[in-house]
C-alpha cells in the first residue's frame, strides 16, 4: 500500500482494529506462479497469526512452495463523490477504508489432524467464548473433516497500516463527508460515518 502522508499510520488504532476483525486475506505466491488468495478466520497473538484452511486450497499449495506471505486485514467503509469536498476537483472522489497488511513467514505448517484440532479449538475460544459444543478432537464426529484441513502460524515480519477514514484535509472536511454519508441512505454509509467521526475526535478544525 502507498504510505501517504495524508494518512499517517496509527499503531494503536491498527491493533484495536485487527482485534475486532474476524477475517483476513491470505496471499501467497508460488515460485513462477500467480498470487493465490483465500479469505480466512484468524487468531492473532502478539507477533503470530494462526489460521487454518483446506489442504486442497491452491493458496495452501502456494504457502508450501513459498512461505513468504502477506495476511491482509481490511474493512471497506464507503465511497464518496468529489462534489462532497470540491465541486470542481474530480480527484476528490475517494474510497474510505481501514487496512493492515502483515508481511509474514509461514511457520509450523501442518496437516496433522491433532494440530488442526488444536488450532480450531483456539479459534473457537476466540470467536465463541463460553459456547457449548462437542470438543474438537480426532474421532468419528470431527475426524473426516480434520483430515481435510491444514493449519499454520504466520510469524509477522513487518506491517503496513493505512486508514483512509475520511478525505484528505481538515477535520471539518472529514466531518462534512461523514454528514453526507449519513444523509445518503446507502447501506453501510451510516457505519462509515461513525468510523470517520470517531477518527477525528479531538482533532482541531
Regions found by a protein language model. Name each.
Residues 32-34, 42-50, 55-58, 68-69, ...:
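Short, charged/polar surface micro-motifs in flexible loops or helix N-caps
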Residues 55-119:
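Short, structured beta-strand-loop surface elements
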Residues 107-205:
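C-terminal edge-of-domain segments
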Residues 14-15, 28-32, 39, 59-60, ...:
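Catalytic micro-motifs at enzyme active sites that drive phosphoryl/nucleotidyl and oxygen chemistry
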Residues 21-23, 66-69, 149:
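Short, surface-exposed beta-edge/turn micro-motifs
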Residues 15-17, 59-63, 142-147, 152:
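A general structural signal for short secondary-structure junctions and capping/turn motifs
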Amino acid at each position: 500500500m502507498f504510505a501517504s502522508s495524508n494518512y499517517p499510520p496509527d499503531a494503536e488504532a491498527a491493533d484495536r482494529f485487527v482485534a475486532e476483525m474476524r477475517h483476513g486475506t491470505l496471499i501467497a505466491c508460488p515460485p513462477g506462479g500467480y498470487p493465490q488468495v483465500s479469505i480466512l478466520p484468524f487468531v492473532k497473538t502478539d507477533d503470530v497469526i494462526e489460521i487454518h484452511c483446506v489442504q486442497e486450497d491452491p493458496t495452501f499449495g502456494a504457502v508450501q512452495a513459498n512461505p513468504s506471505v502477506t495476511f491482509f486485514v481490511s474493512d471497506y467503509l464507503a465511497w464518496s463523490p468529489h462534489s462532497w469536498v470540491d465541486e470542481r476537483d474530480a480527484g476528490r472522489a475517494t474510497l474510505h477504508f481501514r487496512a493492515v497488511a502483515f508481511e509474514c513467514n509461514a511457520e509450523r505448517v501442518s496437516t496433522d489432524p491433532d494440530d488442526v484440532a488444536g488450532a480450531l479449538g483456539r479459534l473457537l475460544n476466540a470467536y465463541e467464548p463460553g459456547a457449548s459444543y462437542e470438543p474438537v478432537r480426532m474421532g468419528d464426529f470431527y475426524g473426516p473433516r480434520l483430515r481435510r484441513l491444514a493449519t499454520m502460524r504466520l510469524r509477522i515480519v513487518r506491517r503496513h497500516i493505512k486508514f483512509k477514514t475520511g478525505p484528505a484535509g481538515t477535520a471539518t472536511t472529514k466531518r462534512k463527508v461523514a454528514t453526507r454519508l449519513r444523509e445518503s441512505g446507502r447501506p453501510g454509509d451510516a457505519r462509515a460515518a461513525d468510523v470517520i467521526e470517531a477518527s477525528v475526535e479531538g482533532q482541531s478544525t
